[in-house]
C-alpha cells in the first residue's frame, strides 16, 4: 500500500496547475495565468465561458518572434496585447470567436502576449509604448 501512495504522489507532482499572479501594465493590475510551455500556450483560454474584469492569460515565449494566434474553441471575445522582451507594448488587436477561421499575427519582436477581456486595453487607455511589469516569480521563466 505504501508503494502505491508514493507512486501516486510522484505522479501528481508532475501535474502542475498554471502559475497565477498579478502583473501591471502602466500601473493597471491584471490577474493572470502564466503560460510558458507550448502546451499551455496552445490551450490558451479555450473553452472559458467568461473572464473576470481584470483576469487574463500571459504567454511567455523562449525568444522574441512573430506569434500567430487563432480563436479555435475560444468562446469569449478577447483583447490581445503584444509586448517585446523589455515589456513595451508593441500593438493590440481584438479577436472575436470564429471557430479558428482567422489567424492573427503579432509584430516580429513579440516576447509576451497578454490575452484579456475585450476592450481591456481601451478601457484603461493603454496604447503602444505602455510598460508591462512582472512579479519576480514570473521573471524566472
Task: List the predicted regions and their residue ranges.
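Compact, glycine-rich, soluble single-domain proteins
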Residues: 16-141
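Sec-dependent signal peptide recognition
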Residues: 2-8
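C-terminal motif of bacterial Sec signal peptides marking the signal peptidase cleavage site
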Residues: 12-14
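N-terminal hydrophobic targeting signals that begin at the initiator methionine
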Residues: 1-2, 16
